[in-house]
Each structure stands twice: as structure tokens, then as C-alpha cells.
Amino acid sequence: MAVVLVCGGSAVSTAKTILYVPQDDRPVDLAYTTETARAAGYTVLTPPAAYLSGASFTGNAEALASWVEAHAGQADAMVLSMDSLLYGGLADSRKHGESMPVLQRRLQRVERWHRQYAQVPIYAFSTVMRSPWAGGRGVEPAYYLTYGRSIYSLAALQYKWHTGTLSAADKQAMFQLMGQIPLEYLQDWYSRRQKNMVLNERLIEDARNHVFTYFCLGHDDNSQHTQSSLEVAYLEKIAAAAGVTDFASFPGADQLGLLLIARAHNDFQQRHPTVQVLYPLGTGGETVPRYDGQAVEDTVAAHIQAIGGREVTTGRPDLLLAVYTPLLRGDGEAATVDNVPIMSASARTFLQQIRRATRQHIPVSIVDLTFSNGSDNTLLYGLYTQHMLYTPTAYNGWNTAGNAIGYGIGQGILAASMTAADRKNMLAVQYLDNWAYQANVRDYVQRMQLKMQRHVWEPCYAEEMTELQSLAKEQVQRYARLYLGLDPHTVEVTLPWRRLFEVAVQIRPQGDVPEEAQVRRQLREDRIKAREERVRAAAAALTQADGNEPADGKTPAQLAARQAYEDAVADLQRETVAAANARTIQEEEERAQTLRTWQPRR
């Protein structure tokens, strides 16, 4: 039974339990999703970390299924990643070696849950395999690092062949690529995609037969004119022909878990929230983001449908989705020189419309799509200078447009059931992740990494990734203090997949997080003190040697003591210079960051 507590006119707690199997253990799939749901009052059951796909290990599909069966009786709803339950996880779906009979047996096991736990609605999500232009270590088959671009180009030409747009030159290029890529790699890549297609077709059939209360098919990094877009078109045609209604298909993967939790939330409350969409001047909803392959307005509409909502253009909506698109058609990367705070008339008008809505007590969720993989510094500058950072209900400007749209709608809906403090923490996490780190700090850390590799920068830690995580934490805490007014001791920052692409930010109100700037300062001071102590010890040893030996100072003992003293002095000088140089470089880089952002208020 659900118990809803009301505070200030909005629900802040619902005693419902959601069993959630994420597609891996990245923050956007696990920590951020579950923190949002728990802040909205839900108890969230998640599998042991050892079962989930991670940075350096595959997920355990069999163990995950057994865990679901052991805990399904405690749940009011289940939100399940089929990529995890079939392959082990999202990345595992791209590189597994499972046979079709094994995969079909796993799917049949999931299908039985509809009968075994008939009282528990199942919300499932899966993905169409992506067609990346290049490989990432550990997230694609190993051969993709070498042949990824060629495979991508070949698939793009095959798209033209399927759509009847292949020219004679294209045909020649296609056959050349087929000759360059080892046949076994092509067979492996297409065989795995075929398995994914067959299983996704079966999942659509399960949605038609009401095995799932709702099923979402995500297009993982789905740019136009790729193998992925061909497969999406085929599966959507199958769903349309079968008349499947409890189904949605749209770009993105990492937002799917949270989106379906929001769908379950609306179903629990028997609500169909109304959503009004606001765009700035420019291409607006017609914008086609680089990783999505379709117009923003189509992606937004599909996400609203997926949460059981209804898009409206008049009246008072339950949520205003403020989608900030680029003035022109392209969306570049956030960590570029173009991402500087220059207020435009379009940005000012957009912010005025948001303020007007919030003054009418209409919840506003901002979706920042100006850049891919991070926030727009201009939009954040406007929110900051107009004291509006905590005015919206939610903010998202991360990774792909589909990711940000899904999170923006999911958090925007669930925020109505949160306390004001939890909403503020949710916003702070997104600002520090999407804006501070993705749009600004990540580029800083990459520059420092190059300096370290070129021996221009003396690190505090010997292990490279430990040093990079320390630098990221130091800078994100600095942004938190200067721009958000947060105590650095409440901001934890890690690089959980030991790469710079994603960060994990956690707000810890108890204030038990070390301030990384102080930690790094202390490490350098301790190194200098250790070398000063070594100089003192060497000086004492030299004095003793001179006192015990002839006065000419040329005995072996005297020479060794003098050399040890000179080495200690030189080592101290090197460390002192390195520390001073590190301070200078860091100050220069922080000034450069300020040019990309703005000078904070004092």
C-alpha cells in the first residue's frame, strides 16, 4: 500500500518499492537514477555491485536473474535492463560471445516472471546496438580499436545501398573496405547485431502480449545513415505493423532506467501529467543533434509519451520542459573554445520565460542541448547572474540530447515528490557534473594530463589516474565553492570507470569529504619537509665525517658524506622548484578556465 505524505501542497514520500536492474554501474545508470528515485520517496532495490557490468568486468546475467527472482516478491514494480539480463550489461551487449540458444533461454526466464509475479508490473528497456565511428577500449570488441572507423564507413555505405542512394564511387569504396577489413571481424560484428535484432523483435512482441507493462527501445548513439538507423527503422516498422501501444523507441540509452521509474511513478498515481515544451529562437525543435539522428521535437514527444504524459500547448501544464537548443543547426562539443559565456537576446528571452513560469509556480525542467557532452556556459552564466540556479525544478545538459531529454523529463516529474533540500541537491549534482566537469574541468584535466606526460607538470600522485581524479575533485570542489556556494567538504568526486569521460558527483551534507586542494597542498608540503629532513640528516652526517677524519676532506667517508649532502640539497631544490612551478601552472590554467566561464561573485 502506498502512503503519501504531503508537505506544502506537494507529495514528498511514497512508500513503494521499485526493483531496479541497471544496464551497468556507471553513475548515470545506477547512482544518479537511484538517488533521484529515493529522493522522490521510493525504496529502490538494486543488485549486488559484483553482478553488474563495470569498467573492468562483465556483468553476470544469470546471477542478476536469480537475484530478481529472490527479491521480486518485495517489489511494487520492476524496472529491468534487458541488456543486463540477456548479455550482462550495455557494453557487454556489444562484445559478448553468447550463443542464440543461451540468449533465448535467458529471455524465456524473464518472460516467466510475468506469470510468476503477476501483481508486479514489469517496465523493461533494451537498446539497438550503436554504430560508433571509432572504438573505445573495453566497450567495443578489441578489433574495433583498429578497424572501427572502417567498419563504420562500410556500414554507412551499406545504408546508402539499402536506401538506393549508392553512387558508382560509393560502390567502389564499399568493396575496397570489404577487402580491407578481416572477414572474421565483419562476421563477428554483424552476427552479434543480428542476435540483438532478433531479441529486440521478441521483446516488442512481449510488449504486445502485455508481458511488460511498458517497453522502451533505446537507440544507443544513433547518428543518421548508420547500421543502427537501419535496424531502428526495421524494428519500429515491426512494432507499428503489430499495433504495439505499450512501447516507445527513441535515441539514447543511459536515461532509460530513470525514465521508466518516472513512468511507474505516474502509473502508481494514475496520473497522465501534461508537459508544455519551450524552445528558444533558432531551429528549436527541428534541431537534429549529432548523436541522435532525428529532430529534437520527435525525441521529446516520444519521451513524454513514454512516461504516460501528454504534450500540451495551452493551459497550465504540470511541467514546463525548457529545451535550450543551439541558435544554428549544429551542436558541437561542450569542451571547445566556442563554449564561452556570451549572452544573446535569445538566451535572455529564454531565461525570462523560465522566470515567468516559476513565478506562476509552474515547475520548470531545463534541458540544455546547445552542446553535446556538457552544458552551455552562456546558459549557466545567465542562470548564475540572475540568481536563478535553484529556480528550476531540474537541469540536465549531459552526454547526448536523448540522455538529457530523458533525465530532464524523469527528474522533472519526480521532483514534485521531493523536499526542497533534495531538489537543491539534485540540481547541484547536475550542475557540477554537466557544467563544472563535463563542459570545463574535463578539458582542464586533459591538459594537465598532457603536461604530466611531457614532464612539464610534477604530479602529487605516482599513479596517473589517481592524479587525474585528484585534479578533477579539486577543481569540481572549487566550482562548487565559488559558483554554487557549497562547502567543498560536502562534495565527493570520483572517476569510477578510471577514464575521463564520466564523473561521479555526490553531495554529502555531513561534510566528511576532504578538501582536495588542502590534501594536495599537504602532500607537496610533506614532500618538501621530507627532503628538508634529509638535508639536515646529510649535513649532520657530513659534520660527523669531517670530525672523525683528516682535515683535507678527501677520505672515502668524507667524499661519500659530501656527495650525499649535495644530492639531498639538489633534491630539495628540485622539489621546491617543482612545487612552485606546479602552483604557477595551476594558477595559469585556472585563469584560463575563468575565461571559459566567468569571474564569480565575491
For the regions a protein language model found, what residue spans apply to each?
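Bacterial N-terminal signal peptides
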Residues: 1-8
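Sec/Tat signal peptide C-region and signal peptidase I cleavage site
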Residues: 11-15
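Charged, low-complexity interaction regions
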Residues: 543-558, 580-584
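Long, low-complexity, intrinsically disordered segments
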Residues: 590-602
